[in-house]
Amino acid sequence: MGQKIISVIGGSGFIGSYLIDKLLELGYYVKIISRKPIAKKNFYPSAKLGQYSLISCNVCDTKKLDKVIEGSFCVINLVGVLEDKKKNSFNAAHIQGSESIMKSCKKHNIQKVIHISALGVDKNKTSKYAITKLKAEKNIKKVQNSIIIRPSIVFGYEDNFLNFFANYAKFSPFLPLIGGGRTYFQPILVSDLVQIIIASINKKFKDGQIIEVGGPDILNFKEILIFLLKELKLKRYFINLPFNVASKVAFFLERLPVKLITRDQVEMLKTDNIVNKKNSYKKFLQYECNSFFIAAKKQLKFYKKNGGH
């Protein structure tokens, strides 16, 4: 294979840590690009001496990004924010950031550009997150040899999904069901998403191809919580919060230092998060994802009795 260079933008997070370790295991040299790069010993157990570099760069800084990605044959964009903050807004992270990536990749004729988006962004017309993520997709599609990967909700040992609700359920007798908990998801294990990203690096697709990714199990939010409580052997009470009520509650929760949920996230829950067969990864790649029930069961063992994070 040789020492090919892959630049991973927004590589310091949950998905990035798994992806980068796998890329290192495969022998790539990886440039880890982030506003605030983080290096932890347990992040990259596959790393060899001098096999990766941590680079501080704001994705909106096109001039610096130009220099940083130069020499890369592949650029993977993982940038995404779930809260619209002044210092890191949806507009900056998603729209301006993707414009910057698009310009830099065009300038350097990058051989492969992989943009990680999210399922449902093309259907939800009220969430700022969805609207800006869709605009980001349109920017990246202007680059030759680009693909868009839209995963459903991603889970794994360090996630902010199962871990959040497992911790919440341990201390609260009540669990909220926004919109009655009827929003459907197709949860995908982080290691499966990583394998699909890696399988896409050297595969030829039409420019701007959309690939939707989800696990084999489709279940709604209430069913996910019922499964979680069963695994933790906890009895909790559900509170049904219609979307309009949840939005009002979120308005006040947004004023807390730690935001449990935002109004925009309530808007996102109005759209199901499942794969469209027309763009399913199974049309392009031969790969079987892990069952949510089996993988999540292993993950939740940490929370039983004296377990937990």
Model-flagged regions — what are they?
Residues S117, E137-F164, A169-F171:
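Conserved beta-loop-beta element that borders a ligand/cofactor-binding pocket
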